[in-house]
Curated annotation (Swiss-Prot):
One biological process term in Gene Ontology: defense response to bacterium
Anything else known: There are six forms of attacin that are divided into two groups: acidic (E and F) and basic (A, B, C, and D).
One cellular-component annotation, GO: extracellular region
Pfam families: Attacin_C, Attacin_N
Key word Repeat present: yes
Family per record: Belongs to the attacin/sarcotoxin-2 family.
Keyword Membrane: no
Name of the protein: Attacin-B
Prosegment location in residue numbers: 18-46
Source species, domain of life: Eukaryota
Function: Hemolymph antibacterial protein.
Location of this chain's protein in the cell: Secreted
Keywords (A to Z) from UniProt: Antibiotic, Antimicrobial, Cleavage on pair of basic residues, Immunity, Innate immunity, Repeat, Secreted, Signal
Length: 233
């Protein structure tokens, strides 16, 4: 068992863990302001999808197609592909989403991560406060990780976080996740500044800090910055 725990810990350090554990919102939150990492919208959007290019060389596309609903509720099918800075597949996701005009939502998705395996994620978001200037939401997710490593069993990750946005211009987020199997905790803090926006394009500056700890590895807070350009369609 110790060897298995150590192996999974090493794997999660080596594999791009933004796809495995905390959805540090990263890519999805920038496009559908989401969770884990998880496309739970703050308001029901009309766009069917988006393409995003990041300054670190990563990129991705997400498509969200309404299935049924009305002006207050919407059920959609969604899919996405993330590419690494070497134009290789980082993650591919498909699933279902529910959005409410008041900012509440939920998703059920399956993601394939090359070099790791698959994961199933259920995520939800509740809008706690919204007016013309402020938007504040809480979110949570539960993920079943299914690694394709011999003799390593499936394991679960749970997490939660909060998102804040001021005038659709300045945003902040805080997230935490826990994985029992390897006793790993992940933490992330993030900020976002919108530099330019039209109904179909957005240019943003992103900054963040993240850390993790396990019985075998502990990291310090690691800073990151990036620019991202998104085209909605």
């Amino acid at each position: 068992m110790f060897a298995k725990l150590f192996l999974v810990s090493v794997l999660l350090v080596g594999v791009n863990s933004r796809y495995v554990l905390v959805e540090e919102p990263g890519y999805y939150d920038k496009q559908y302001e989401e969770q884990p990492q998880q496309w739970v919208n703050s308001r029901v959007r009309r766009q069917a999808g988006a393409l995003t290019i990041n300054s670190d060389g990563t990129s991705g596309a997400v498509v969200k197609v309404p299935i049924t609903g009305n002006e207050n509720h919407k059920f959609s099918a969604l899919g996405s592909v993330d590419l690494t800075n070497q134009m290789k597949l980082g993650a591919a996701t498909a699933g279902l989403a529910y959005d409410n005009v008041n900012g509440h939502g939920a998703t059920l998705t399956k993601t394939h991560i090359p070099g790791f395996g698959d994961k199933m994620t259920a995520a939800g978001k509740v809008n706690l406060f919204h007016n013309d200037n402020h938007d504040f939401s809480a979110k949570a997710f539960a993920t079943k990780n299914m690694p394709n490593i011999p003799q390593v069993p499936n394991f679960n990750t749970v997490g939660a976080g909060v998102d804040y946005m001021f005038k659709d211009k300045i945003g902040a987020s805080a997230n935490a996740a826990h994985t029992d199997f390897i006793n790993r905790n992940d933490y992330s803090l993030g900020g976002k500044l919108n530099l330019f926006k039209t109904p179909t394009t957005s240019l943003d500056f992103n900054a963040g800090w993240k850390k993790f700890d396990t019985p075998f590895f502990k990291s310090s807070w690691e800073p990151s910055t990036s620019f991202s350009f998104s085209k909605y369609f």
